[in-house]
Regions:
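Phosphate/NTP-binding elements of NTP-utilizing enzymes
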Residues: 2-235
């Protein structure tokens, strides 16, 4: 009959605990809260016991969120100045949708991969609960430090959450890059800088909102950039 030391039993117990995933309990949920800098200086709070992630919002952001929730909304736009939290809103909205719909696919778009890496994607990673989630180096995958992420494949630009939903990290520099794929929703950041191909991109993305769970909505976050394709579409 085998016997185990107290240390061996403790090690086995810790191993079982470490292998217990959040997916074995309840899928994490996101709640919208009102800004409370003294309580949540980062504008977000993660409660691991309840699996609830709270994102703070201000009035204009809440109006944009309400627009995305309206029935038959194809496109919602949040137009605001620099430092207004528009990219924060887009990232948080996308994460909420991705957690709400299991085994689905969502798309986060930046101007191009180089610009998005240091802005759109970085902000998206920073909105994940956990420590140092926004840091990505040759030897460190920050998003994988989040309790709601199971994998970040930087080669394929793919973030997989604990509910098996994938967030595809995309680029708008070629309008037909994602033809043939399916998405439950799309967040397009800095749309005002996409150029005249935005009309073709919009038509293509609209045809891709099918086949998987999601609100079937596109959220544009942008700063005004004159009378261009984005202006025409929003008007």
């Amino acid at each position: 009959m085998s016997s185990f030391t107290e240390r061996e039993i403790q090690n086995q117990f810790e191993e079982v605990i470490s292998q217990t995933s959040v997916t074995e309990t309840e899928t994490p949920a996101i709640e919208w809260g009102e800004a409370n800098p003294s309580k949540r200086p980062d504008g977000m709070d993660w409660d691991p016991e309840s699996n609830i992630l709270t994102y703070d919002t201000w009035e204009a952001q809440r109006r944009a969120i309400e627009t995305t929730n309206q029935e038959h909304t194809d496109i919602a736009a949040f137009l605001a100045g620099y430092g207004s939290g528009k990219t924060l809103l887009g990232a948080r909205w996308l994460i909420k949708q991705a957690l709400q719909y299991d085994s689905s696919r969502f798309l986060a778009l930046g101007i191009d991969f180089q610009k998005a890496r240091d802005t759109t994607f970085r902000v998206l990673f920073e909105q994940l609960p956990g420590d140092r989630t926004g840091i990505v180096t040759s030897s460190y995958n920050g998003p994988e430090e989040s309790p709601i992420v199971v994998d970040y494949n930087r080669k394929d630009h793919r973030l997989t959450l604990v509910n098996d939903t994938v967030i595809k990290l995309g680029s708008a520099d070629r309008w037909n890059r994602y033809a043939g794929d399916s998405y439950g929703g799309v967040w397009a950041d800095e749309v005002g800088h996409y150029g005249d191909d935005l009309h073709d991109l919009l038509e293509m993305l609209g045809s891709r909102l099918r086949g998987v769970g999601g609100p079937q909505t596109q959220l544009f976050t942008l700063t005004g950039n004159g009378k261009n394709a984005a202006f025409d579409i929003i008007e």
